[in-house]
Design a protein with these regions (language model features):
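Structural signature of tandem-repeat unit edges
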Residues: 1-13, 18-32, 41-55, 65-111, ...
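Consensus positions within tandem repeat domains that build extended binding/scaffold surfaces
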Residues: 35-37, 58-60, 114-116, 136-141, ...
Length: 217
């Protein structure tokens, strides 16, 4: 288990984890996990977030290749965990995931937040539930193991860099419900990437305009 000395904390903000434990329990009293706090901590397998945490920065757990279990302590006002996802409460959005994440199909989760799975290179499969309306900026940025994605008819927006540098991504089904795709959504993806779209849809036009192969279904 982790030791308090392994954490660099300033005024309740967890700046950086400096330990080498495979099971990490963030100390109670931490109110924010700053951007890059656990970046490249490749040995961590599980993380427990205390109920005192009110904010989690972008890329906080990026490139944690061994991370397979994420838990938020019960009683947290801002976040909850389910299916190894951290979910922002209220209008529910997934803000953090790992290679073992299963996005809940409860019907309450409306989006995948900015950089939620960024740097999750070991993620090779993800099911997007039919309640999801948007993919935030960099939602799957750097998910180099992801090979195929099917977006449900509920999705309307794909954010900037949502699938940037997903080097193994070869197919993605995008429904006609999607009305906005960022120009940089697929930057750095394989030349073999095929977007599967409806004929005469916005997505078909997007693929052709951006030099991406398109298959009509």
């Amino acid at each position: 288990m982790s030791d308090i000395k392994d954490f660099e904390i300033e005024n309740g903000a967890l700046i950086r984890y400096k330990g080498a434990s495979i099971q990490v329990e963030i100390p109670t009293g931490v109110t924010s996990i700053e951007s890059f706090a656990f970046k490249d901590c490749k040995e961590i397998e599980s993380i427990k977030i205390p109920k005192t945490v009110a904010s989690i920065g972008y890329f906080a757990f990026s490139c944690c290749d061994s991370l397979e279990k994420i838990e938020v302590e019960e009683g947290c006002y801002e976040f909850r965990s389910e299916g190894n996802c951290v979910i922002k409460t209220g209008r529910e959005v997934v803000v953090l995931g790992c290679k073992n994440s299963k996005i809940p199909e409860s019907g309450t989760i409306v989006g995948i937040g900015n950089y939620a799975f960024s740097g999750c290179v070991m993620l090779d499969d993800i099911k997007i539930p039919s309640s999801i309306e948007f993919l935030g900026e960099g939602a799957f940025y750097g998910c180099a193991g992801l090979e195929s994605v099917v977006l449900p008819d509920s999705v309307t927006c794909i954010g900037q860099g949502a699938f940037k540098e997903c080097y193994s991504l070869e197919s993605i089904v995008i429904p006609s419900s999607v009305a906005l795709i960022s120009r940089e959504a697929f930057d750095g993806c394989s030349e073999n990437l095929v977007i599967i779209a409806k004929k005469d849809s916005y997505t078909e036009e997007y693929a052709k305009a951006n030099g991406i192969k398109v298959s009509i279904k």
